[in-house]
Design a protein with these regions (language model features):
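Mobile beta-alpha loop/short-helix "lid" or hinge segments that flank ligand
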Residues: 1, 36-38
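Histidine-acidic metal/acid-base catalytic patches
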Residues: 4, 17-21, 25, 29, ...
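Short, structured patches in soluble enzyme cores that scaffold and shape functional sites
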Residues: 30-36
């Protein structure tokens, strides 16, 4: 069935208006990450998060039009879903609350073997910025075009940089050094 007409929207409509109203009252913005939270077979087919695609975001924002509700945007999640990760930056510029700087590598040979309906980790791997398939030049052009001045957070989930404090420091420095070429400030 169409995820846009699922029981999740009834639950969203029941649960979120009060939370968003409280955020408005406190002058706080809520950013829901666009990660499907789909990692294992028990989460298939839809994952554990509603806010995963532009069609769903439109429905959410129609249901709760408050500007206190927005997105914690991570381009990598659209890449592995075979979607354009740049266009939503322009389309949802007024809803971007927080941005994750995380890349992803889609392994075509694994995708060809497992298919798009496999759990996503069967064919992709989270990567540091610059080590995957996100076009960071286009990404930073877009966030510069829309004059985004909110938080940018390096999200390290690259398995090649796990195991020790030195690996973690290396991941952060490698990411920072790559990203610095795009920052206008």
């Amino acid at each position: 069935s169409d995820v846009c007409s699922s029981d999740l929207f009834r639950l969203f409509k029941k649960t979120w208006p009060g939370i968003v109203q409280l955020a408005e009252d406190l002058g706080v913005k809520i950013g829901i990450e666009n990660c499907p939270m789909l990692f294992t077979n028990d989460e298939w087919p839809g994952g554990k998060n509603l806010a995963t695609t532009p069609a769903i975001w439109d429905r959410m924002f129609d249901m709760i039009p408050s500007k206190a509700l927005g997105l914690n945007y991570d381009p990598s999640h659209l890449v592995w879903q075979m979607m354009d990760p740049i266009k939503p930056i322009y389309d949802y510029k007024d809803r971007l609350v927080h941005i994750h700087l995380k890349d992803v590598k889609v392994y075509k040979d694994k995708l060809d073997r497992n298919g798009i309906l496999a759990t996503p980790l069967a064919y992709h791997s989270p990567k540091l910025p610059g080590l995957g398939d996100v076009n960071w030049n286009n990404f930073f052009t877009a966030i510069t075009d829309i004059r985004y001045r909110g938080p940018l957070c390096i999200e390290v989930e690259d398995k090649a940089f796990e195991g020790s404090d030195a690996d973690i420091r290396s991941a952060i420095l490698t990411s920072r050094n790559y990203i610095n070429q795009f920052l206008p400030y």
